[in-house]
Design a protein with these regions (language model features):
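Transmembrane beta-barrel wall of Gram-negative outer-membrane proteins
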Residues: 24, 238-271, 275-314, 345, ...
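C-terminal beta-signal and adjacent terminal beta-strands/loops
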Residues: 704-705, 709, 827-845, 849, ...
Length: 953
């Protein structure tokens, strides 16, 4: 008994002695102006791989594997000037460096980039064409990603060839990516720059605390009231990119007595037009967060976001139009009563409400549970020129009406249309010259024509032939998740989460404006009888809803199409992180279940019936089970030299957009639909010293079983007969395989305390690696239309999506008197046009009967189908700022000038698929005065500026 007791006392004494001899570094970080603690500050022991962050009280500690001797602590946080603190660590002692301060950084570029990603890129046709630097807001600490975010993004550049659908954006741990297309809708929190500064970014597929992640990284925007520094900010911005002016005001309380904290923000952005003509901007944004610290273990936070955004849109144009009108031309706007009015207006209004509970179960175990509700609509307007009226004569019904295409750049209004013959006549030249002068002097949308046309028809007792239509997505989504973060040991950490999302999406067309008319007959004027059955009679086929035939739609009514999509996603994730003296590594896995179902609320006349083969009622229920595994390793050669490697394999459910072949008209699902398979790997060499930082990365990503759907009007489809080759089609591609490989480099050198040199480079190749399956569907023919072996020959073509190669050199100067200036030169090359899939199918070689053209020439065909590579270009950008401290106020400005030398360049484009066979394309491309249906291009902005003036207190 005595022996046991003595052993017990010895054990206690040994433990106490060991504890007393433990080497510890601890401290705290305060705001240099307010003296308030700063949470989420990154503390790094330089030339080691040891990093930690401050807690809500601004405190931190290193308690294991602490290096001895002279060390340097690097203290950094976005929005503050980075500082370095030298310390001396003795074995068995505690170094207490409490009260370190960080000063506000008036030259931080975060505000600028939030503008870029949230505002400039909302004009994309597919919600992802230009907002291609997903999750890089926090990534400015990485040299290469900083260049990609601030200087490369205006060119459609995509790091590693990945768009926003390959990255995850979270707010307070809740995923914000849309289930419709997999992309984050940045406009949902646009204009809230001041409350987006607290972000946690994880690059690529590496370990993160919240979910499995994705190839382009994971960005968690922390919008907790307690995480904002105490104080307020008022600012005004002037620009000529997307909006012309922005006013913003915000205030954060900091932690108050009783454990309360709150944060509020309001902003307005406005402009008659941006750099592109006629692109109006009208947006109001509001934010509120309130948090209660219930006790030392529990915090409850509420966040509300309302960001309404209304914007005029623009489009790609042909070279002919560009030569006549320039890169600022936009065919969508015209004057109405002396005011600019855009026919294509996009409006987004989807508020977000969320409640977050934070539970510190113990010092080593934390549980975060969240619930969010998002609702509202996205609408896109366009002109409907298919208005008609029903006429019955001798017992037969027909529809009279319809109108000419109203597009301002319609091909029949351009000079090339009148000069299409090989030997134009004098009259042809006269008409071409008249068209040229009319287009140069005006060339804008004619609103008066629409009102006059409707007035004329109304006087004759007819319905409107023109109307302003809005395509509406009205979503309601609820999200739940719970996130576990546990320290299993000093060097082992467990992350896990469970997630659930439920979406009800109503999709319909709505009459926004009858343009002076009295009503709109809800039928398809362009419908055709495609069968011999009595049910295919035109009066039936043309109906948008045969359960309510020949309905007259008024303003605010749903018409044309009306359906719901229900979607549900359940997922689980687990990850373990291990840290040792020489090696850190992690492993992670996830599993998910996704299901979609369409419910038709209109029974379309072209696709009568209920169930999966009709248009009314419920479609087949699509179910996808997916999984993923990932791992990574960091080998610390020394404190300055590191090797990092990551690898993953995972599957992804197709998006809603790519699951239904024509959701607006029927319940048909994509034939051969599968989850996409993704494999990726990257290896990096990292060098870090007090003067030089560098990262060199090689990466590989492979994609299999991808799916994509496109919509367009085309002519001369093979095999349908001489009179039946024209159709508006849905083009479905399945079994798409792609490969992205390349190298990234980031380098910076702090050559003096005030001057920093920097360089970045990306050398990539992003190509298709097989010939995917292709088929067409349409209401102009029955079934699925395939050509030849059913594939399109795009193997080895480049995936369109900005330049594959980008290079930067630049410098920054930061003066001790609180002003700074920076200049970068950025070179871009190897950008390619988006190739037509139809032109590379067997349809290209076949006539209307499906036979091969007798004059087909392979050499000419290769020349016609050569994928266009855009010209290289160089852009120079300048950035600078200055701040003053007046009593307790900071007053300052921040300015940028992009494309200083007004370089003209092409950022993207696509081949039109209107002409899809060898003879028609050869004929069109060989015209002396230019093609009628040439490729369309997006052109980059000229010289633009952004100026922000602010007061912070």
């Amino acid at each position: 008994m005595k022996k046991s007791f003595l052993l017990f006392l010895f054990g206690v004494a040994f433990s106490l002695t060991s504890f007393a001899q433990q080497t510890i570094i601890r401290g705290s970080v305060l705001d240099g102006t307010t003296g308030e603690p700063i949470p989420d500050v990154t503390i790094t022991i330089e030339e080691t791989n040891q990093t930690t962050t401050t807690d809500a009280k601004g405190e931190f500690s290193f308690i294991s594997n602490v290096p001895l001797g002279e060390q340097v602590l690097k203290v950094e946080k976005i929005g503050y000037v980075t500082k370095r603190y030298p310390i001396v660590v003795n074995e068995g002692s505690t170094v207490d460096i409490s009260g370190m301060t960080l000063d506000y950084d008036p030259g931080d570029k975060k505000d600028l980039f939030t503008i870029s990603i949230s505002d400039d890129n909302l004009n994309s046709e597919d919600d992802g064409l230009t907002d291609n630097v997903s999750g890089l807001l926090q990534a400015s600490r990485d040299i290469f990603l900083s260049a990609a975010a601030f200087d490369f993004s205006s060119t459609f550049f995509r790091p590693r060839g990945l768009d926003n659908a390959n990255g995850k954006v979270l707010i307070n741990g809740i995923e914000m990516n849309k289930q419709f297309n997999g992309r984050p809708q940045w406009a949902n929190w646009g204009g809230l720059n001041d409350v987006q500064r607290n972000q946690e970014f994880t690059m690529g597929i590496s370990a993160n605390d919240y979910n499995f992640g994705d190839l382009a990284g994971t960005n968690n925007i922390v919008m907790r009231a307690s995480k904002y520094r105490k104080g307020g900010r008022i600012s005004y911005a002037s620009a000529n990119r997307s909006y012309q002016g922005r006013v913003m005001a915000s205030y954060n309380s900091g932690l108050l007595k009783g454990g309360w904290s709150y944060s509020f923000l309001g902003s307005r952005r406005f402009g008659a037009e941006g750099f592109i003509d006629g692109t109006l901007y009208d947006s109001n944004s509001f934010f509120a967060a309130v948090e209660k610290q219930i006790n030392d273990k529990h915090n409850l936070n509420f966040t509300g976001i309302y960001a309404q955004n209304r914007r005029g849109r623009s489009t790609a144009i042909t070279n002919e139009v560009f030569e006549l009108k320039g890169r600022e031309y936009n065919p969508f706007w015209g004057l109405q009563n002396g005011d600019i009015r855009n026919s294509r207006v996009r409006e987004i209004e989807e508020p977000i409400l969320m409640l977050n509970h934070y539970w510190d179960i113990s010092p080593k175990v934390r549980l975060n549970s969240n619930v969010a509700y998002q609702f509202g609509e996205i609408s896109n307007t366009r002109i409907d020129n298919g208005g008609t009226r029903l006429v019955t004569f001798n017992g037969e019904s027909s529809f009279l009406g319809g109108a000419r295409n109203t597009n301002a750049d319609y091909y029949q209004d351009l000079p090339s249309f009148f000069l299409q013959d090989p030997n134009p006549s004098a009259l042809d030249f006269q008409q071409a010259f008249a068209a040229q002068q009319e287009f140069i002097n005006d060339g804008q949308f004619d609103w008066n024509l629409l009102y006059e046309g409707n007035a004329t028809v109304a006087a004759q007792g007819g319905n409107s032939i023109y109307a302003l239509q809005a395509d509406v997505i009205d979503d309601s989504q609820i999200s739940f998740n719970t996130i576990l973060d546990a320290d299993l040991a000093d060097n082992i950490r467990l992350n896990a989460s469970l997630n659930y999302r439920n979406l009800n999406s109503q999709n319909y067309a709505r009459i926004e404006d009858l343009l002076g008319g009295t009503g709109y007959l809800d039928v398809d004027f362009f419908a055709e009888e495609i069968g011999q059955d009595v049910t295919d009679l035109l009066e039936t086929v043309a109906q948008s809803d045969i359960r309510n035939p020949n309905r007259i739609a008024r303003e605010g009514d749903r018409y044309k199409y009306n359906y719901e999509i229900d979607a549900e996603v359940v997922s689980g994730f687990a990850q373990a992180q291990f840290k040792y003296n020489k090696v850190d590594f992690f492993v992670g896995a996830n599993v998910s279940q996704t299901n979609y179902q369409r419910t038709g609320l209109f029974e379309n006349g072209n696709f009568t019936g209920t169930g999966p083969q009709g248009s009314f009622g419920e479609s087949e229920k699509l179910d996808f089970t997916n999984y993923g595994i990932k791992g990574g390793l960091t080998y610390k050669i020394s404190g300055r030299h590191l090797i990092n490697a990551n690898g993953s394999y995972f599957t992804k459910a197709p998006t809603i957009r790519n699951s239904f072949s024509n959701a607006r008209q029927n319940n048909f699902t994509v034939t051969g639909l599968e989850s996409e398979k993704v494999q990726s790997a990257d290896v990096s060499y990292i060098f870090r010293s007090p003067i030089i930082k560098a990262r060199l990365t090689g990466f590989y990503t492979g994609f299999e079983d991808g799916t994509d759907i496109g919509f367009y009007f085309t002519e001369d489809l093979a095999g349908l007969g001489i009179d039946n080759g024209d159709a508006f089609v849905q083009e479905i591609l399945t079994n798409i395989e792609r490969r992205n490989i390349g190298i990234e480099l980031g380098f910076e050198a702090q050559v003096t305390p005030t001057i920093k040199l920097k360089a970045a480079a990306s050398f990539g190749q992003y190509t298709f690696t097989n010939n995917p399956n292709l088929y067409l569907t349409s209401d102009d023919f029955e079934g699925e239309l395939r050509f030849g072996d059913g594939t399109t020959n795009i193997k080895d073509l480049h995936v369109a999506g900005g330049p594959e190669r980008a290079y930067q050199v630049g410098f920054e100067y930061r003066d001790p008197d609180f002003w700074n200036v920076g200049v970068t030169s950025n070179f871009f090359s190897n950008a390619y046009i988006d190739a037509s899939n139809l032109s590379r199918s067997a349809n290209f070689t076949s006539d209307f009967d499906g036979n091969t053209f007798n004059d087909f020439d392979p050499a000419t065909a290769r020349e016609l189908l050569q994928q266009e590579q855009f010209d290289d270009y160089l852009l120079v950008n300048v950035v600078g700022g200055k701040s003053w401290k007046v009593d307790d106020y900071f007053i300052g400005f921040f300015a940028t000038i992009n494309n200083v030398f007004d370089q003209q360049y092409t950022t993207g484009g696509f081949e039109q698929s209107r002409l899809g066979n060898f003879r028609r394309i050869r004929e069109d491309q060989s015209r002396d005065n230019g093609p009628l249906f040439g490729s369309r291009y997006f052109f980059g902005n000229g010289t633009t500026y952004y100026l922000n003036v602010y007061v912070r207190f």
